[in-house]
């Protein structure tokens, strides 16, 4: 029932008025307009199509009239009652009657009835934090101190907005300064929290001991207004909601940054796959050098960025756990609401700096890597020009292909790790949303308690007023009858008149009681119908909002699924092409080595070690044949130095 009246989701709460835009500003404006009236004054029955300025002007005019009437009634009750002839009572609106009853009750002296009312209020305030719908009530946001604190600009904006909304009602409340005094003659101060009662009592005692005679201090004390005790709590809950919304926006920005990094890595992978086809036309030495340099640079940049992100995530989780541990074990403290505000903004700042720092570090590493590539290319251009034989190109090609494959595997692993990080951030975002819904539930429970207290207060005030009116009317009638009967001389006429008057009184009492019963029944029926209509309207709005939200979520999930399928197809095509190229190269090497006469035809499957041994044997036989010819004195052109270097390098590799 109360979830329909006070919805916990932000979409349902923001769409309470169809003219308002869904956002934080509209929510705050409507919330402050309701709370500025003290939550004890019923809102005027205005149509929804009326603008906020018209509603505010109508509220202010009605409040001004009600306060003037209230002041006159309070001054009339303070004087001695004067007997006047019976007049027709003036009918007032329900809002004016409610305001007059509330302020008359607060301005009455401390008799037995007021003492019982005050004790009941204090008992209700003491028991309220233990209510099951209110989790460990305090004057600040419950278990939300680790979620972060707003910046100074946000705080200044909040102060400006609240001052503008309260400035209109401040002038109106100054008109009832005379009726806001208690028995001691002091103005009743703000009721901010339960923990401030002792301070206010001590301050009153100090004022009675050492009164201030200056007119400036007296004028400032007269400007203080009386407000309900729960307003400060509701304002702090609103402040906590604004902080949570700011944090949700920050998390969304971080998720966008991570998605952009993932797209950049995908683009790098595509560029590498495109550049792989161009590497076949390059010389073997230069291709090998470029592949080694690019592999080293890619590994460096990716490993550094990933390690930095891991450190930042671990640091952020540690800060979250450290800030959440003392909040869980702490007793409900109603007065300490401003202790942990300095530590709330640290995790978000660490995350922002970590994300931007990782991006800048990756950019700097790529710049340094490009400079090193240019220097190495200039140094090794001369060595690569000497390698011209086709047989020497096979080994660098094979190495370049293996390096490219390992680099592609590392890039794929990095992409999977970044997707895991994005999932973690989404989980944190859901946690903040659940905390946001908890805060809205606390506000709804507070509003429920306020409405319940107001209804009880209205019932008691209406009963008291009806009894007082009946008493006054009966006194006036008795006074008139005694005046008449004193003028009568005959006893019989006097007795007959008294009997008739008593019968009339009984009939009138019965009629009045019946009319009162009918009136109360009608009022109850009207109030129940109004509540049912409002509940049904809000339920319809909630259902519409939920439908729209589910549709939007379904569309987003469908688009994400299509993007993931496209990326998977691209990666599969690239992997199959690279495997086919590697298989063709291996087949060519096998054909070149085992097609020579004198080689053994292996019946089993040819392994990489067999191919390597065959190549080494061919090279060693060639060098032996060259040495034999040289020893016999046959003139043979000398072998090139690069060939001898390659044979020694291959022998070292086999020995290892």
Curated annotation (Swiss-Prot):
Residues 1-31, 139-163, 320-403 are annotated as: Disordered. Residues 336-351, 369-394 have a biased composition (Acidic residues). Residues 241-278 form a coiled coil. Keywords: Coiled coil. It comes from the Eukaryota. Residues 139-148 have a biased composition (Polar residues). This is Coiled-coil domain-containing protein 27. The gene is CCDC27.
């Amino acid at each position: 029932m109360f979830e329909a009246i006070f919805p916990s989701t932000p979409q349902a709460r923001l769409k309470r008025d169809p003219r308002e835009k869904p956002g934080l500003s509209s929510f705050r404006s409507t919330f402050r307009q309701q709370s500025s009236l003290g939550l004890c004054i019923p809102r005027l029955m205005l149509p929804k199509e009326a603008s906020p300025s018209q509603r505010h002007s109508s509220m202010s005019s009605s409040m001004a009239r009600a306060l003037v009437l209230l002041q006159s009634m309070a001054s009339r009750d303070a004087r001695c009652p004067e007997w006047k002839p019976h007049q027709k009572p003036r009918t007032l609106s329900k809002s004016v009657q409610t305001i007059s009853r509330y302020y008359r009750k607060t301005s009455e002296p401390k008799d037995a009835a007021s003492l019982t009312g005050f004790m009941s209020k204090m008992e209700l305030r003491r028991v309220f934090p233990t209510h099951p719908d209110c989790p460990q009530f305090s004057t600040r946001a419950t278990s939300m101190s680790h979620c972060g604190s707003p910046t100074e600009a946000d705080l200044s904006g909040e102060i400006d907005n609240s001052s503008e909304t309260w400035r209109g009602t401040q002038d109106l409340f100054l008109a009832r300064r005379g009726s806001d005094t208690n028995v001691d003659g002091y103005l009743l101060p703000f009721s901010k929290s339960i923990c401030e009662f002792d301070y206010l009592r001590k301050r009153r005692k100090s004022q009675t001991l050492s009164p201030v005679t200056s007119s400036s201090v007296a004028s400032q004390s007269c400007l203080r207004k009386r407000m309900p005790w729960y307003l400060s709590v509701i304002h702090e809950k609103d402040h906590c909601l604004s902080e949570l919304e700011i944090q949700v926006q920050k998390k969304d920005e971080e998720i966008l940054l991570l998605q952009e990094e993932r797209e950049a890595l995908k683009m790098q992978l595509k560029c590498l796959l495109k550049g792989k086809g161009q590497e076949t036309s390059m010389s073997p030495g230069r291709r090998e050098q470029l592949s080694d340099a690019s592999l080293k640079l890619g590994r460096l940049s990716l490993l550094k960025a990933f390690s930095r992100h891991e450190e930042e995530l671990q640091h952020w989780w540690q800060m979250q756990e450290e800030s959440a541990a003392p909040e869980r074990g702490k007793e409900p403290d109603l007065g300490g609401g401003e202790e942990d505000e300095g530590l709330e903004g640290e995790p978000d700042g660490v995350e922002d700096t970590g994300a931007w720092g990782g991006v800048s570090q990756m950019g700097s590493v790529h710049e340094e890597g490009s400079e090193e590539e240019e220097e190495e290319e200039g140094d090794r251009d001369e060595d690569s020009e000497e390698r011209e034989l086709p047989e020497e190109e096979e080994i660098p090609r094979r190495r370049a292909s293996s390096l490219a494959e390992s680099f592609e595997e590392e890039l794929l692993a990095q992409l999977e790790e970044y997707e895991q990080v994005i999932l973690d951030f989404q989980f944190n975002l859901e946690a903040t949303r659940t905390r946001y819904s908890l805060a809205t539930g606390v506000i709804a429970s507070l509003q429920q308690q306020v409405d319940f207290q107001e209804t009880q207060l209205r019932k008691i005030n209406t009963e008291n007023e009806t009894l007082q009116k009946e008493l006054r009317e009966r006194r006036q009638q008795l006074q008139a009858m005694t005046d008449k009967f004193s003028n009568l001389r005959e006893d019989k006429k006097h007795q007959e008149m008294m009997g008739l008057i008593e019968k009339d009184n009984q009939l009138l009492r019965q009629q009045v009681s019946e009319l009162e019963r009918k009136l109360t029944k009608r009022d109850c029926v009207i109030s129940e119908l109004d509540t049912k209509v409002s509940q049904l309207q809000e339920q319809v709005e909630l259902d519409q909002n939920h439908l729209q939200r589910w549709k939007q979520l379904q569309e987003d999930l469908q688009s994400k699924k299509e993007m993931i399928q496209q990326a998977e197809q691209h990666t599969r095509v690239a992997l199959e092409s690279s495997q086919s190229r590697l298989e063709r190269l291996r087949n060519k090497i096998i054909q070149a080595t085992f097609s020579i006469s004198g080689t053994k035809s292996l019946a089993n499957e040819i392994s990489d070690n067999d191919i390597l041994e065959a190549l080494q044997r061919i090279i060693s036989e060639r060098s032996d044949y060259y040495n034999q010819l040289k020893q016999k004195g046959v003139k043979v052109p000398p072998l090139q130095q690069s060939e001898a270097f390659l044979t020694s390098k291959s022998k070292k590799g086999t020995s290892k």
